[in-house]
Amino acid sequence: LYRGSSGMAGEVGHIRLSKGGSFGYGKEGSFEGFCSGNGIKEMARRMYKEREEEGSLEEQDKGITDFTVKNLASLVKGGSPFARSVFDRSAYYLGRGLALLIDILNPECIVIGSIYERCEALFKEKVEAVIREECFTESVNLCKIEKSELSDNIGDFAALSVAMEVHAGGK
């Protein structure tokens, strides 16, 4: 893995995808802000407030107070236009971010965990459409987007990897 001069290389969550948007680690409009659990929750709250003020919420979406990804996914399954729009926006930015990585790195495969892993059916079609629109055809045709098989243990494996590196004398 490439670590960079300060050890921060590969922190793609900090890439700014938009001037505005949810915060991820204090950076407005970042990949993390649009695609992480907390980022999606904040984005959903903002979107809900805007639509509530505009009076543009569908009747079935009035009164939503739980903006967690888990609840929003459940609402999508129940036909909520608002919850669907939250996932569509997140998927759009996930697709844009992945398209940048595909164009820069030209990988054979990108493995995504966490929210994508749990909600793949709500993201996949939109993410793939954005990637096809944004990337070189040759790159898209050779890059697979896979969901991680590490489930919620991904953080444990990351911590273990850091501990092993420190123990082995790394930075």
Task: State the predicted function of each range.
Residues G7-G24:
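A short, polar/charged loop-to-alpha-helix boundary motif
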Residues L1-G7:
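Hydrophobic alpha-helical segments and helix pairs
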Residues K19-K171:
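ATP-binding/phosphotransfer module of carbohydrate and carboxylate kinases, centering on a glycine-rich
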